[in-house]
Structures are given as structure tokens and as C-alpha cells.
């Protein structure tokens, strides 16, 4: 998304940004009236559209409602990226039913168009000191939310050091 902004002032950063292919991911949040009797709180799924399922309500400090989060795998998500959310939800619900889950009381599908990077970078951040331009984000540091936070923090520290602000 930022490529046009980087091409003129920071061609090396533009090249880096161009190297990563952003892939989409469908997720589905489910709410149930009562806890599900499944033998797991989270699982990686190796067949069908699902990649990851988790009992979100099992995390400490969560509300008592039974809530599950489902993530579809990247290939399936890409194949269905422009599908209607309701249709995607039904396909994902059917896959979750194969794991023993009933239909939820409420569900909501969410398409994340830019969810994952291929290849996965592992460089924390990128910085062009002459231009004072940097890049950070989950796409540069593991692809997860904690990677986004540590990437942003590391770039902020670099900016502070570069401008002698400490």
C-alpha cells in the first residue's frame, strides 16, 4: 500500500516493500450460549478451510460468554477473498462442525485483506537515515501482533537515536 509513497524518496525501502506478498485471511468470531464440549481450547487444523481455532473465552480476564475464533488458511482465504462474508461464514461453520462444534448463537465474519506476508520477514524494521524514513510492522517481524508492536518500538528507538533525542 505504501509503495508509491516510497519509490522516489527511498527506493531501497520501496524494493523491500515490493518483495513481500500480502495474503488475506478470513476469520470468524462465534458466540455460544454455553461452553462447548470440545476436547481442546485451541487447535491447528490441517485439512479443509480452517488453519486455527481457539476458545477465545479461555484466555485469562475474558468475559464468561463462550467465544471461539476461527482463522482460515491462506490459500483458502485467497480463493474466497472477494466472496460474500455470509457465504464464507457458512463454509467455515461447516468445517468447525466437522470438529464437533454446533452452530453458534451469533457469528461475525471478518476479511483481513493484508493479514500475512510471504515470505515472512525477520528484520524488525527498516530505516533510511539520510531521508529519515522508516518502515515497521508485523510484516517485517514475524507477522503477528506482538511482532508489530516490537517492530514499531524498535523503529522508534532508532529514530530517537538518529536524531539525538535522548
Give the residues covered by each predicted segment:
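Short glycine-/acidic-enriched loop or helix-start segments at secondary-structure transitions
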Residues: 2-6, 118-119, 145-146
Amino acid at each position: 500500500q505504501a509503495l508509491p509513497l516510497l519509490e522516489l524518496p527511498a527506493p531501497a525501502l520501496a524494493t523491500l516493500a515490493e518483495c513481500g506478498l500480502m495474503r488475506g485471511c478470513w476469520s470468524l468470531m462465534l458466540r455460544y450460549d454455553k461452553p462447548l464440549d470440545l476436547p481442546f481450547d485451541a487447535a491447528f487444523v490441517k485439512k479443509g478451510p480452517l488453519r486455527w481455532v481457539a476458545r477465545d473465552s479461555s484466555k485469562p480476564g475474558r468475559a464468561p460468554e463462550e467465544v471461539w475464533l476461527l482463522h482460515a488458511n491462506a490459500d483458502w482465504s485467497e480463493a474466497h477473498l472477494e466472496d460474500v462474508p455470509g457465504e464464507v461464514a457458512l463454509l467455515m461453520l461447516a468445517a468447525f462442525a466437522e470438529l464437533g462444534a454446533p452452530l453458534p448463537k451469533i457469528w461475525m465474519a471478518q476479511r483481513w485483506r493484508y493479514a500475512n506476508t510471504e515470505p515472512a520477514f525477520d528484520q524488525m524494521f527498516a530505516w533510511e537515515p539520510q531521508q529519515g524514513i522508516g518502515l515497521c510492522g508485523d510484516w517485517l517481524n514475524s507477522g503477528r501482533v506482538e511482532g508489530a508492536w516490537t517492530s514499531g518500538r524498535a523503529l522508534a528507538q532508532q529514530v530517537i537515536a538518529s536524531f539525538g533525542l535522548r
